[in-house]
Amino acid sequence: MRGSQEVLLMWLLVLAVGGTEHAYRPGRRVCAVRAHGDPVSESFVQRVYQPFLTTCDGHRACSTYRTIYRTAYRRSPGLAPARPRYACCPGWKRTSGLPGACGAAICQPPCRNGGSCVQPGRCRCPAGWRGDTCQSDVDECSARRGGCPQRCVNTAGSYWCQCWEGHSLSADGTLCVPKGGPPRVAPNPTGVDSAMKEEVQRLQSRVDLLEEKLQLVLAPLHSLASQALEHGLPDPGSLLVHSFQQLGRIDSLSEQISFLEEQLGSCSCKKDS
């Protein structure tokens, strides 16, 4: 019974060794390891001279020897052919429980603060940490106070918002409300908003008035343009020059009429006398 148990254990050992050697095969993240051939032992017949005592003539003890032969072993000058051996490539190791699967990356130094090794020498850091081994804290408060409404307090790997004295943080963390109730809008004692609105309305009224005046100014020009075409003039400017000339003639005629009226008046006075 004991002999059969020993044979069974021997077979299990052979299977385990063979399974380990055959667990790896060339492939992804599995590399061939350079193996040296093992020395070969060979057997040979060794001649040995064995001394012994015997009885010679005259009943004397004599020493002589005899030749015997036995099997001996010696190392052969050659080497046995090396079998290919495989192992995980540098930077990778076996995944626990999966023989032959080299899926676990190795990071040296190891990743810190909850970081995971995703590739040899490369760590993936959780939120709040950075660096080659996730050793440095990220200062969330350096950019826009971390989104806090009033104060931002940076901690190792995280941050939190803090309100001024007399205020408390809202449930969603976006507002700091006065303790005892929601914030109320304080009246504006300076009346800046009202004055600004009045100024905007006043400027808008001026713009409307200027637009009306512009239309009044442009109306004669449109009329002049049509009249210039009627008089055969090339442009409204020529019509203006022509109109000014006519006005000059009218003024001259008015002066002459006034002079004639004065003369007529003086003549009537002399006739009456």
Curated annotation (Swiss-Prot):
- Span of the annotated motif Cell attachment site: 130-132
Q: Which GO terms describe its biological process?
A: angiogenesis; blood vessel development; cell adhesion; negative regulation of Notch signaling pathway; positive regulation of endothelial cell proliferation; vasculogenesis
Q: Where is the signal peptide?
A: 1-23
Where found in the cell? Secreted, Extracellular space
Q: Does the keyword Calcium apply?
A: yes
One Pfam family name is FXa_inhibition
What S-S linkages are listed for this chain?
Answer: C31-C89, C56-C62, C88-C102, C107-C117, C111-C123, C125-C134, C141-C152, C148-C161, C163-C176
Q: Where is the EGF-like domain?
A: 103-135, 137-177
Which ranges form a coiled coil?
192-219
Question: Key word Transit peptide present in the record?
Answer: no
Quote the function comment for this protein: Regulates vascular tubulogenesis in vivo. Inhibits platelet-derived growth factor (PDGF)-BB-induced smooth muscle cell migration and promotes endothelial cell adhesion to the extracellular matrix and angiogenesis.
Q: What is this protein called?
A: Epidermal growth factor-like protein 7
Q: Which gene encodes it?
A: EGFL7
